[in-house]
């Protein structure tokens, strides 16, 4: 199953993705994003973690303003495109 990194504060999204069968990893620092097929961030510190500096080869989804369901749909779509 694809590995999805999710920022710590996005608990509802983590739980929903786990329910969909994804391997969810909590993003606490830059290295946590390595090996992830997709990362979900809050958008508050969009590049503080360095995720958009090509730490991960996967998609980066900004969860700002989206519901957990909307974010999970985006994760699903992006991972199917890869």
From Swiss-Prot:
InterPro entries: UPF0180. It comes from the Bacteria. It holds the Pfam family UPF0180. Belongs to the UPF0180 family. This is UPF0180 protein BH2667.
């Amino acid at each position: 199953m694809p590995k999805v990194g999710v920022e710590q504060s996005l608990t509802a999204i983590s739980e929903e993705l786990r329910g969909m069968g994804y391997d969810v990893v909590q993003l606490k620092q830059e290295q946590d994003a390595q090996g992830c097929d997709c990362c979900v961030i809050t958008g508050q510190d969009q590049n503080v973690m360095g995720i958009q500096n090509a730490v991960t080869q996967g998609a980066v989804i900004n969860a700002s303003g989206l519901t957990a369901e909307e974010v999970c749909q985006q994760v699903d779509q992006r991972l199917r495109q890869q």
